[in-house]
């Protein structure tokens, strides 16, 4: 059996409130439900999926640093840090791990301050506006890209 791919899923601030936080924008699934669904998909794809949700920028940065040389791909929903965090951008650049930026809502159809991302220009791609399905699309894309590069 081939070595398992190792993918890190990161979720930023307030995503722990999914299911009750503005369900018209973010859907009714909780983060636990989304991650459980994604774990089942990852298992079927022979992928190890690690997950961290944090409201603290430093915790996400520390986990990105720890991923160096151990993680093949990062899936990140930076949430509000999308629009503010040069530090997360720098951490992602420092580890040189390809990543996909995920957003539940279509950030380009939201308020002007939500339309700028400090991560999009360095991401392998951005998936937004497809709700929880965006996580699945990101996982499938990461696995496909990794299998093409090996």
UniProtKB/Swiss-Prot annotation:
Gene: aroQ
CDD domains listed in its UniProt record: DHQase_II
Enzyme class: lyase
Protein's UniProt keywords contain Disulfide bond: no
Enzyme Commission number(s) of this protein: 4.2.1.10
Protein name: 3-dehydroquinate dehydratase
UniProtKB keywords: Amino-acid biosynthesis, Aromatic amino acid biosynthesis, Lyase
Species for this entry: Citrobacter koseri (strain ATCC BAA-895 / CDC 4225-83 / SGSC4696)
Catalytic activity: 3-dehydroquinate = 3-dehydroshikimate + H2O
Gene3D superfamilies: Dehydroquinase, class II
GO MF terms held by the record: 3-dehydroquinate dehydratase activity
GO biological process, one term: quinate catabolic process
């Amino acid at each position: 059996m081939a070595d398992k791919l190792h993918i890190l899923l990161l979720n930023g601030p307030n995503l722990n409130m999914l299911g009750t936080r503005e369900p018209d924008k973010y859907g009714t699934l909780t983060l636990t439900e989304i991650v459980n669904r994604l774990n089942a998909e990852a298992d079927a794809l022979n992928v190890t999926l690690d997950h961290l949700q944090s409201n603290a920028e430093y915790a996400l940065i520390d986990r990105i640093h720890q991923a160096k040389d151990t993680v093949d791909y990062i899936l990140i929903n930076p949430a509000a840090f999308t629009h503010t965090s040069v530090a997360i951008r720098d951490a992602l650049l420092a580890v040189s791990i390809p990543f996909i930026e995920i957003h539940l809502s279509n950030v380009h159809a939201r308020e002007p301050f939500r339309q700028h991302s400090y991560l999009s220009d360095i991401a392998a791609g951005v998936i937004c506006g497809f709700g929880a399905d965006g996580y699945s699309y990101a996982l499938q894309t990461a696995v496909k890209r990794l299998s093409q590069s090996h």
